[in-house]
Amino acid sequence: MFKNERDGIIMEWEKLNVDDFSNAIDESKGVILIPIGCLEKHGSHMPIGTDILIAREIAIRASRIENVMVFPFIPFGIVGEVKHKLGTISLTSNLIYNMLDELCDEVARNGFNKIVFVDGHGGNHNFLKYFIYFTSFL
């Protein structure tokens, strides 16, 4: 298993080689966290990526408590009131739904049977409830 001296076992998808990845699936018992947020204006006092940075950090800290895999963050979410502001990326809900649907299929194909979204953006709440209710995988 890939380790570093400070944090112990690394369970971050993108940092593992193929052999470590296979072991991580077993270690995680098939559980994966997918951080999701959005890129949006938060004023001049906070980064545009605040939502995804928070969601990613929560997922990484959780993986240090429980052996669960962490997927690279998804920087796209449902943006309403600031969708036309500088730095904001606003995609359609259909595109995000289809992306998440295919992503869940691919994550399952790779050996994960329990997918947990770690949401850092309030605008995603109802959308994710809808997605989880209607998706064929979850």
Give residue spans per PLM region:
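A generic structural signal for alpha->beta connector loops
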Residues: 30, 67-68
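Glycine-rich loop at the start of a catalytic domain that most often binds anionic cofactors/ligands
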Residues: 45-52, 83-87
